[in-house]
Curated annotation (Swiss-Prot):
Fe(3+) 1 binds at D66, Y98, Y198, H259. This is Lactotransferrin. GO terms for molecular function: metal ion binding; serine-type peptidase activity. Belongs to the transferrin family. The lineage of its organism: Eukaryota, Metazoa, Chordata, Craniata, Vertebrata. It comes from the Eukaryota. Keywords: Disulfide bond, Glycoprotein, Hydrolase, Immunity, Ion transport, Iron, Iron transport, Metal-binding, Osteogenesis, Protease, Repeat, Secreted, Serine protease, Signal, Transport. Hydrogencarbonate 1 binds at T123, R127, A129, G130. Hydrogencarbonate 2 binds at T465, R469, A471, A472. Gene3D superfamilies: Periplasmic binding protein-like II. The gene is LTF. Monomer. Found in a complex with LTF, CLU, EPPIN and SEMG1. Found in a complex with MPO and LTF; interacts directly with CP, allows Fe(3+) incorporation into LTF and activation of CP ferroxidase activity. Residues 1-6 form the signal peptide. Disulfide bonds join C15-C51, C25-C42, C121-C204, C163-C179, C166-C189, C176-C187, C237-C251, C354-C386, C364-C377, C411-C690, C431-C653, C463-C538, C487-C681, C497-C511, C508-C521, C579-C593, C631-C636. Pfam families: Transferrin.
Length: 695
């Protein structure tokens, strides 16, 4: 008996919110038994919110929620996460999301930040694409102090006239002024109002009643099958530009995700839930069985357990939590409708920097203090976790190596400013307007290891700044991959320190962790052999035979330039560079002996935050940059005792990108191609997550 009680429950406890759902769930349970699939049991509650609480308390396992509730469920103390998304059919392509867009007629001449006083068309009050997203996005421009003042009143005063079906037309006649229904049907919450829903809101624009329609990406295509007709319309983008209607992936107010099944983020039984859903859709999905249909409800009750319009489910990669699933624009728009005007304005003005590891966090806090809180800090223990915080809108920016600019770019972030180093050219333009020259990736060895060349590295011990970074991973490993065709880098070198690799593997064997020998192989400065200085230290302390760093690393840490005990007696002449032709040269001759030229590190952010971020960073570097009045007195942005915290210590300034504003343009096609090839060797959980989110 004891054994039976200890056996894990093999049944998924599905949470229901009404008698009709409970009845469908019971049918679901019986039919899964018949096909001997994973078993499901039914838990009765009276609302989605009660279900969220029950799942968090381990009294139920799963429930399907819409985007707004996925947001609630992800918050503390529930911390649920989406594990499977419903898939819908849109224009022949199965989708797990749609995009909320603002459609206008070509030539109407205004941008998203100039909508005050125009006429607006909405799908309906309280709907995602037609109300919550656009009004949340326009919140900073509304004259609304926030709850408890009615939002409808502020919107009625913002647009010159609108059609917002379901609005309170008696109290706010302006919100129903453009609607076309007659008498009681004017502004009705159904298709009795001709301008209701997606197609209705578009018709309101098409007929010339309104100037802008807030709809979804497929609306224009469904209503105008002819491309020539579609060409008369454009989308308004968050960066206050316009784009063609088919560019909705680059130009939308928010991505609205489909309904998702949520579970606990710890011990959530998600494998079992997925087995149940996968089998259920195979047996009882669209056009499968007449006995029971998973995506069919009763005529009186729609969308029981799942949406009736769903085609099936896809599994959500485990890296994705509710914030990543919903995305920054959606989260910001939602937050904007819950906060006071002062809170919204403060959040927009502030720049939240993401610090990687405790040492960067300390420097960031100092920066925040001296900036009068114009800069605030978020922190994470790895660079990829920081990129995820920017994707969720919990941070605005961080400075990245080229390898991570690639990851961030694949996730939809853009480069904003690049680090620039002192130029050799004395009559070059000022730092901010000088094109960043990039830096040289080099392989450094001890002069005393005279027999070691680029061609005899196999079986040696290697030191790397971190996995996925440019100079120490993507460039040398890309070259080795091209030579050997093998991804087994742990077999090529006998031992390595490559922070960010599997701590149990030989790629972490040489790593040492912090002074307490903890956090070994962590990709942040807790690992003493992390970053350019750390990888060189790994060579200098004779742990490794070769260090992959950049051209200035040896120069910055020898001949007394670094006063730390391990570096103070090192001499530049005791180290040499390996050239790709099998020869060696002094470290000062990197120009003619390097592995590749690498793009400079650059600051990335969401595209709609880029202009504001630039403005703030230029002011900050004017004050705390190398030539600023407050460096070294109060704080130096580009100094950190040779640790390269937040920025590289040899940065002269953050510079304009010379028009290279996408990750592909900034990194250059050669580097992008080499990383794409190298990525076949390793999977990054964040890249997998972003591939799912941007599919």
């Amino acid at each position: 008996l004891g054994l039976c009680l200890a056996a894990p429950r093999k049944s998924v406890r599905w949470c229901t919110i009404s008698p009709a759902e409970a009845a469908k769930c019971a049918k679901f349970q019986r039919n899964m038994k018949k096909v001997r699939g994973p078993s499901v049991s039914c838990i009765r509650k009276t609302s989605s919110f009660e279900c969220i609480q029950a799942i968090a308390a381990n009294k139920a396992d799963a429930v399907t929620l819409d985007g707004g509730l996925v947001y609630e469920a992800g918050l503390h103390p529930y911390k649920l996460r989406p594990v499977a998304a419903e898939v819908y059919q849109t224009r022949g392509k199965p989708q797990t999301r749609y995009y909320a867009v603002a459609v206008v007629k070509k030539g109407s001449g205004f941008q998203l930040n100039q909508l005050q006083g125009v006429k607006s068309c909405h799908t309906g009050l309280g709907r995602s694409a037609g109300w919550n997203i656009p009004i949340g996005t326009l919140r900073p421009y509304l004259n609304w102090t926030g709850p408890p003042e009615p939002l409808q009143k502020a919107v009625a005063n913002f647009f010159s006239a609108s059609c917002v079906p379901c609005a309170d037309g008696k109290q706010y006649p302006n919100l129903c002024r453009l609607c076309a229904g007659t008498e009681a049907d004017k502004c009705a919450c159904s298709s009795q109002e001709p301008y209701f829903g997606y197609s209705g809101a578009f018709k309101c624009l098409e007929n010339g009643a309104g100037d802008v329609a807030f709809v979804k990406d497929s609306t224009v295509f469904e209503n105008l099958p002819d491309e020539a007709d579609r060409d008369k319309y454009e989308l308004l983008c968050p960066d206050n530009t316009r784009k063609p209607v088919d560019a909705f992936k680059e130009c939308h107010l928010a991505r609205v995700p489909s309904h998702a099944v949520v579970a606990r983020s710890v011990d959530g039984r998600e494998d079992l839930i997925w087995r149940l859903l996968h089998r259920a859709q195979e047996e009882f999905g669209r056009n499968k069985s007449s006995a029971f249909q998973l995506f069919k409800s009763t005529p009186e009750n729609k969308d029981l357990l799942f949406k009736d319009s769903a085609l099936g489910f896809v599994r959500i990669p485990s890296q994705i939590d509710s914030g990543l699933y919903l995305g920054a624009n959606y989260l910001t728009a939602t937050q904007n409708l819950r906060e006071t005007a002062a809170e919204v304005a403060a959040r927009r003005e502030r720049v939240v920097w993401c610090a990687v590891g405790p040492e960067e966090e300390r420097k960031c806090k100092q920066w925040s203090d001296v900036s009068n809180r114009k800069v605030a800090c978020a922190s994470a223990s790895t660079t990829e976790e920081c990129i995820a915080l920017v994707l969720k809108g919990e941070a605005d920016a961080l400075n990245l190596d080229g390898g991570f600019i690639y990851v961030a770019g694949k996730c939809g972030l853009v480069p904003v400013l690049a680090e620039n180093q002192k130029s050799q050219n004395s009559n070059a333009p000022d730092c901010v307007h000088r094109p960043p020259e990039g830096y040289l990736a080099v392989a450094v060895v001890r002069k005393s290891d005279a027999d070691l060349t680029w061609n005899s590295l196999s079986g040696k011990k290697s030191c790397h700044t971190g996995v996925g970074r440019t100079a120490a991973w993507n460039i040398p490993m890309g070259l080795l991959f091209n030579q050997t065709g093998s991804c087994k880098f742990d077999k090529f070198f006998s031992q390595s320190c490559a922070p960010g690799a599997d701590p149990q593997s030989s790629l972490c064997a040489l790593c040492v962790g912090n002074n307490e020998n903890e956090n070994k192989c962590m990709p942040n400065s807790e690992e003493r052999y992390y970053g350019y200085t750390g990888a060189f230290r790994c060579l200098a302390e004779k742990a490794g035979d070769v260090a992959f760093v950049k051209d200035v690393t040896v120069l910055q840490n020898t001949d007394g330039k670094n006063s730390e005990p391990w570096a103070k007696d090192l001499k530049q002449e005791d180290f040499e560079l390996l050239c790709l032709d099998g020869t060696r040269k002094p470290v000062a001759e990197a120009e003619s002996c390097h592995l590749a030229r690498a793009p400079n590190h650059a600051v990335v952010s969401q595209s709609d935050r880029a202009q504001h971020l630039k403005k703030v960073l230029f002011l900050q570097q004017d004050q705390f940059g190398g030539n600023g009045p407050d460096c070294p007195g109060k704080f130096c942005l580009f100094k950190s005792e040779t640790k390269n915290l937040l920025f590289n210590d040899n940065t002269e300034c953050l510079a304009e990108l010379q028009g290279k504003t996408t990750y592909e343009q900034y990194l250059g096609s050669e580097y992008v191609t080499s990383i794409t090839n190298l990525r076949r060797c390793s999977s990054s959980p964040l890249l997998e997550a972003c591939a799912f989110l941007r599919a």
